[in-house]
């Protein structure tokens, strides 16, 4: 069973991730891509699923980071580095393939989504590392 520190870190990082996603997708990408391509993007999706999805993504990242922090280290910089690696692993092929697979998916949006997602994972990694910091053994 995970510690209270783990769950608080997931909660805080999940809230921050949702706020950032809300701003990026409603203020920037929404008007630029989503609303201008109503055939490409579903307009009837319940927004609750985006919130749930962010919390699930943060939980999975936290779980993985908890397992590999002994390799990466547990500092904020180490969490950001782990986030960068995970973000590249997840985002780079995903968004480029979306452009290759779906008619009308803008190539520019593939790169915007890739870069934004990597930065998202870096931010989440830094938050999780800061909050899940493992203390050294007592002297």
Q: Where are the regions a protein language model picked out?
A:
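Juxtamembrane/disordered regions of integral membrane proteins
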Residues: 1-139
């Amino acid at each position: 069973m995970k510690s209270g520190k783990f769950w608080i870190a997931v909660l805080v990082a999940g809230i921050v991730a949702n706020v950032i996603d809300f701003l990026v997708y409603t203020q920037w990408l929404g008007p630029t891509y989503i609303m201008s391509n109503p055939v490409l993007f579903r307009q009837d999706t319940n927004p609750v699923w985006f919130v749930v999805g962010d919390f699930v993504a943060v939980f999975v990242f936290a779980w993985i980071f908890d397992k590999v922090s002994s390799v990466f280290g547990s500092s904020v910089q180490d969490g950001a580095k782990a986030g960068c690696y995970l973000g590249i692993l997840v985002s780079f092929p995903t968004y480029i393939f979306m452009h290759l697979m779906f008619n009308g998916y803008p190539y520019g949006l593939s790169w915007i989504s890739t870069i934004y997602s990597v930065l998202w994972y870096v931010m989440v990694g830094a938050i999780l590392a800061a909050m899940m910091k493992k203390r050294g053994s007592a002297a």
